[in-house]
Curated annotation (Swiss-Prot):
Signal peptide: 1-23
Function: Vertebrate-selective toxin that causes pain by targeting voltage-gated sodium channels.
GO CC terms: extracellular region
Source organism of this protein record: Pogonomyrmex rugosus (Desert harvester ant)
Family stated for the protein in its record: Belongs to the formicidae venom clade 1 family.
Keyword Signal: yes
Residues that make up the propeptide removed upon maturation: 24-53
Keyword Signal: yes
Name assigned to this protein: Myrmicitoxin(1)-Pr3b
Keywords, comma-separated and alphabetical: Amidation, Ion channel impairing toxin, Neurotoxin, Secreted, Signal, Toxin, Voltage-gated sodium channel impairing toxin
Residues where Serine amide is found: 73
Main localisation: secreted
């Protein structure tokens, strides 16, 4: 069975977007910088760190939704 080219490209794109998200420095803010900035900055950094993986997941699912008709017809 031959793997469709668009499916292969989609899997690679999702893999790359996931690795880029976890490599982002905002996901793990430095403790020293957070302590100097205060509790407000700590709350913002924590919220951003928690939201980024979800945003990456949502963005990775958008191409799959647009490919759904092509998968069903092919």
């Amino acid at each position: 069975m031959e793997i469709p080219k668009f499916l292969f490209i989609t899997v690679i794109a999702i893999g790359l977007s996931g690795s880029l998200t976890w490599a982002n420095p905002l996901a793990n803010p430095e403790a020293e910088a957070t302590a100097e900035a205060g509790p407000e900055a700590e709350a913002v950094a924590e919220a951003v760190g928690e939201a980024e993986p979800a945003v990456s997941l949502i963005l990775s699912l958008i191409p799959l939704a647009s490919l759904s008709p092509a998968i069903k017809s092919g």
